[in-house]
Amino acid sequence: MLTLTSYFGFLLAALTITLALFIGLNKIRLI
């Protein structure tokens, strides 16, 4: 159970970082 929770946490963190980078690149491209 703990491994599943940590796996989902890691997946969520990776998704958040990817989304943040994507938004950052889009903002830089707009400027």
Swiss-Prot record:
The membrane topology noted for this protein in its Swiss-Prot or TrEMBL record is:
Single-pass membrane protein
InterPro entries membership: Cyt_b6/f_cplx_su6 (IPR007802)
- Which GO terms of the cellular component aspect does the record hold? chloroplast thylakoid membrane; cytochrome b6f complex
**Any Pfam family:** PetL
Q: Where in the cell is it found?
A: Plastid, Chloroplast thylakoid membrane
Listed transmembrane segments: 4-24
What's a GO biological-process term for it?
photosynthesis
Keywords, A to Z, come to: Chloroplast, Electron transport, Membrane, Photosynthesis, Plastid, Thylakoid, Transmembrane, Transmembrane helix, Transport
One MF term in the entry's GO annotations:
electron transporter, transferring electrons within cytochrome b6/f complex of photosystem II activity
Describe, as the record does, how this protein assembles with itself and its partners.
The 4 large subunits of the cytochrome b6-f complex are cytochrome b6, subunit IV (17 kDa polypeptide, PetD), cytochrome f and the Rieske protein, while the 4 small subunits are PetG, PetL, PetM and PetN. The complex functions as a dimer.
* Family as reported in the entry's similarity comment: Belongs to the PetL family.
Purpose: Component of the cytochrome b6-f complex, which mediates electron transfer between photosystem II (PSII) and photosystem I (PSI), cyclic electron flow around PSI, and state transitions. PetL is important for photoautotrophic growth as well as for electron transfer efficiency and stability of the cytochrome b6-f complex.
**UniProt protein name:** Cytochrome b6-f complex subunit 6
| Organism, as annotated | Triticum aestivum (Wheat)
